[in-house]
C-alpha cells in the first residue's frame, strides 16, 4: 500500500477577516479563530432565542380557526346535493355506470354499439392492462340523464357482449341500491362467512 502524505495547512485569520460583535474593529484583541464569535440570530427561532413555532405542511398560515372558517365560508364551492337515501349518486358531470365482465378484446366501438341505443354516451373509459395490452375487464360509461343510465342498466345487466355475460350497475352509489341484489353480489356462493386465510409460512 502506498503511503499518502498529507500536508497540514496552518491558517491564521487576519484582523479584517474576523466578524466584530458590536460593529467595532478588533484592536489587539485575541485574534485566534476560536475566540468568541458573535452568535448568528436565527430567523426561525427569533432574535431572543425563543423556541421555533412548529408548523405543518406547505404554505402554512398563522390564523385562528375562526378566521379560517370565515375565509372558507365566504367562497362558493361546487358540490353535489344528496337526499341521504341509498341509491345511485350523480358524478360531477353525469351519471356513470360500471360494466364488469368485459371481454379482453373488446373495443370502444363494441361498447358504443351496445350501449349507445339507450342515450348519448358522454364519456367512455375502457382501461387497458399495460403489460398485455388487453382490456382489464371493465368499462365506465357516462350518460347525461339518469333515465338513460337506468335503462342501460336494466337492459344490459346479464346480457352477452362478445361471448361473455356482463354485469352492469351504478359506478357511484350511497349504500345498497337494492337490498336483495346487494346481498347476492357480496356473498360468495351463498356462504355467509369469509373463508379462513392459509397459515403464514416462516
Swiss-Prot record:
Pfam families: RRM_1. Residues 7-24 have a biased composition (Acidic residues). The modification Phosphoserine is found at residue 32. Residues 59-78 have a biased composition (Basic and acidic residues). GO terms for molecular function: mRNA binding. Heterodimer with MAGO. Part of the mRNA splicing-dependent exon junction complex (EJC); the core complex contains MLN51/CASC3, EIF4A3, MAGO and Y14. Interacts with PYM. The interaction with PYM is direct and dissociates the EJC from spliced mRNAs. Weakly interacts with EIF4A3. Core component of the splicing-dependent multiprotein exon junction complex (EJC) deposited at splice junctions on mRNAs. The EJC is a dynamic structure consisting of core proteins and several peripheral nuclear and cytoplasmic associated factors that join the complex only transiently either during EJC assembly or during subsequent mRNA metabolism. This is RNA-binding protein Y14.
